[in-house]
UniProtKB/Swiss-Prot annotation:
<dbReference type="InterPro" id="IPR007229">
    <property type="entry name" value="Nic_PRibTrfase-Fam"/>
</dbReference>
<dbReference type="InterPro" id="IPR040727">
    <property type="entry name" value="NAPRTase_N"/>
</dbReference>
<dbReference type="GO" id="GO:0004516">
    <property type="term" value="F:nicotinate phosphoribosyltransferase activity"/>
</dbReference>
<dbReference type="Pfam" id="PF04095">
    <property type="entry name" value="NAPRTase"/>
</dbReference>
<comment type="function">
    <text>Catalyzes the synthesis of beta-nicotinate D-ribonucleotide from nicotinate and 5-phospho-D-ribose 1-phosphate at the expense of ATP.</text>
</comment>
<comment type="pathway">
    <text>Cofactor biosynthesis; NAD(+) biosynthesis; nicotinate D-ribonucleotide from nicotinate: step 1/1.</text>
</comment>
<dbReference type="GO" id="GO:0034355">
    <property type="term" value="P:NAD biosynthetic process via the salvage pathway"/>
</dbReference>
<comment type="similarity">
    <text>Belongs to the NAPRTase family.</text>
</comment>
<dbReference type="InterPro" id="IPR006406">
    <property type="entry name" value="Nic_PRibTrfase"/>
</dbReference>
<keyword id="KW-0597">Phosphoprotein</keyword>
<dbReference type="InterPro" id="IPR041525">
    <property type="entry name" value="N/Namide_PRibTrfase"/>
</dbReference>
<keyword id="KW-0436">Ligase</keyword>
<feature type="modified residue" description="Phosphohistidine; by autocatalysis">
    <location>
        <position position="222"/>
    </location>
</feature>
<dbReference type="Pfam" id="PF17767">
    <property type="entry name" value="NAPRTase_N"/>
</dbReference>
<protein>
    <recommendedName>
        <fullName>Nicotinate phosphoribosyltransferase</fullName>
        <ecNumber>6.3.4.21</ecNumber>
    </recommendedName>
</protein>
<dbReference type="GO" id="GO:0005829">
    <property type="term" value="C:cytosol"/>
</dbReference>
<keyword id="KW-0662">Pyridine nucleotide biosynthesis</keyword>
Length: 398
C-alpha cells in the first residue's frame, strides 16, 4: 500500500479545503490528469493504480493526525471535526487505459469531497511506474546527488539560504521521500530544533512535518483561484474575489498569494495597496523568476510598502544552482523562501514523470490557468481561453 495516511499530502490541500468547507461547500468540480512526457506508457499499470486508489479510499484520519491538525494555529476546530468523519470516495474518480498507451484519470464531484485526491493519486502513479520500470533502484546514486546538493547549499555566504521540500506529488517513492527528509533534517538542521535556525525550512508534506517535527508549509494552489472564475461575481474580478475570500477566512494569516494564474501583469493590476499590506508576499511558479522578482519588488516600492517586510517564494522547477543564483540576486532586498520538488525527491538518474492533475471545470463551466509559461495550460476549451485572455488583457501566445 503506497499511501498509508491521509496526511501524506500537501498542507495547501487542507488550507484550501477549509476555505471550501466554510465559503464554497456546494461547489462541483472536475479534475483531469496529464502526463507531459512524450512516449511514456502508463496503461500497463492501470489495474495496479486502481488497486492503490481503492486502498487510499479506505483510509480515515487517525486521532493523533487530527490532534496534529488541530494544533496548527490556522486550522479551525469545526474543520477538524469534519475531517474526523471524512474519507475519499472511489465513485468520484475514474482511471482508464487509452489505446495510445496513456491513461486518463478524471475526478468529478463535490469540491469538498474531491480536493484531497490530487496529491496522493499523483504519488501513486509515480511510485507504481517506477517500481515497475526500475526494479533495482540506484539509491547510492540518489544519495550521492543529495549529498552534492547539501554540499552546494553549505558553501560560504549561504548561511541564511533556506530550502523547503515541495516534492510529494512527484517523488520516486514514499520510502525515498522519507529518507531524503531525514537526511535534510540532520544535515541542514531545521527551524524548530536546537535554537539556531538551519537551512531546512520544512516540508509541504503534513505527515512528515508531523513525524519529523518540522514546519508544514503551504497556502494556496492554482485550483483555488481557478475555481473562483466560476464562483466569483464577475470573471474580471475573480482573482480579487479569490484573495478577498482567502482574507475573509484567514484574516491575514497564510498570506502568500499565488501570482501566475493569469500571468504577472494581471496579478499586479489586481494586487493593490490593500493586498500588498495584507498578504505576506507572493509565490512564483512560472516564467522568468528574476524578472518576476524585480517586478514584484518594484510594485511594493510603488505602493510605498517596504520589500524587506515581504517574502518572495520561488517554487518553479527549482534546482540548487538556480536557487543559489536567485538567492544571490535577491538576498538582503526582501525575505526569501525556496521550495524544491522533483529535483529533491526524484533525482536518482531516471527521467522523472512530468505529471499533473488540474481542475478543468467548476460548477459546470470551464476554468483555466493562463500562466507565464504557455506549455502549462491544461484547458482544451479554446473559446474560453480566448475569452479569458481578452478579459485579463493577455496577448495570445505566438
Amino acid at each position: 500500500m503506497i499511501i498509508t495516511s491521509l496526511l501524506d499530502t500537501d498542507l495547501y490541500k487542507f488550507t484550501m479545503m477549509q476555505v471550501v468547507l466554510h465559503q464554497f461547500p456546494g461547489a462541483q468540480v472536475e479534475y483531469r490528469f496529464k502526463c507531459r512526457n512524450p512516449g511514456v506508457e502508463l496503461a500497463p499499470f492501470v489495474s495496479e493504480i486502481r488497486d492503490e486508489i481503492r486502498a487510499l479510499c479506505s483510509l480515515q484520519f487517525q486521532d493523533a493526525e487530527l490532534a496534529y491538525l488541530r494544533s496548527l494555529r490556522f486550522i479551525k476546530s469545526d474543520f477538524v471535526d469534519f475531517l474526523g468523519l471524512f474519507r475519499l470516495n472511489e465513485k468520484y474518480i475514474r482511471v482508464s487505459a487509452l489505446p495510445s498507451g496513456e491513461i486518463d484519470i478524471t475526478i468529478t464531484g463535490p469540491w469538498l469531497h474531491t480536493i484531497l485526491f490530487e496529491i496522493p493519486v499523483l504519488a501513486i502513479v509515480n511510485e507504481v511506474y517506477f517500481r515497475n520500470t526500475q526494479k533495482v533502484p540506484d539509491f547510492p546514486e540518489g544519495r550521492r546527488r543529495l549529498e552534492a546538493k547539501i554540499g552546494q547549499l553549505q558553501q560560504p555566504g549561504l548561511d541564511s539560504l533556506k530550502i523547503a521540500d515541495y516534492g510529494t506529488r512527484r517523488r520516486f517513492s514514499r520510502a525515498w521521500h522519507e529518507e531524503v527528509l531525514r537526511v535534510l533534517c540532520v544535515r541542514l538542521g531545521s527551524d524548530d530544533r536546537r535554537g539556531a535556525p538551519g537551512q531546512f525550512a520544512g516540508t509541504s508534506n503534513v505527515l512528515y512535518a508531523m513525524k519529523l517535527g518540522v514546519t508544514p508549509l503551504g497556502t494556496m494552489a492554482h485550483e483555488y483561484l481557478q475555481a473562483c472564475q466560476s464562483l466569483g461575481p464577475r470573471l474580471r474580478d475573480s482573482q480579487v474575489f479569490g484573495f478577498e475570500m482567502w482574507a475573509k477566512e484567514y484574516r491575514g494569516d497564510l498570506g502568500i498569494a499565488l501570482s501566475d494564474v493569469y500571468g504577472m501583469s494581471a496579478f499586479l493590476r489586481d494586487f493593490d495597496l490593500y493586498f500588498c499590506k495584507l498578504f505576506d508576499g507572493a509565490r512564483h511558479d512560472s516564467g522568468d523568476p528574476f524578472a518576476w522578482g524585480e517586478r514584484l519588488l518594484q510594485h511594493y516600492r510603488d505602493n510605498r510598502v517596504d520589500p524587506l517586510t515581504k517574502t518572495l517564494i520561488f517554487s518553479d522547477a527549482l534546482t540548487v544552482p538556480r536557487i543559489i543564483e536567485l538567492y544571490q540576486r535577491f538576498n538582503g532586498r526582501c525575505q526569501l523562501a525556496f521550495g524544491i520538488g522533483t529535483n529533491l525527491t526524484n533525482d536518482l538518474g531516471y527521467e522523472p514523470l512530468q505529471i499533473v492533475i488540474k481542475m478543468t471545470r467548476c460548477n459546470g463551466q470551464p476554468v483555466a490557468k493562463l500562466s507565464d509559461a504557455p506549455g502549462k495550460n491544461m484547458c482544451n476549451d479554446e473559446k474560453y481561453l480566448a475569452y479569458l485572455r481578452q478579459v485579463f488583457e493577455i496577448p495570445s501566445p505566438q
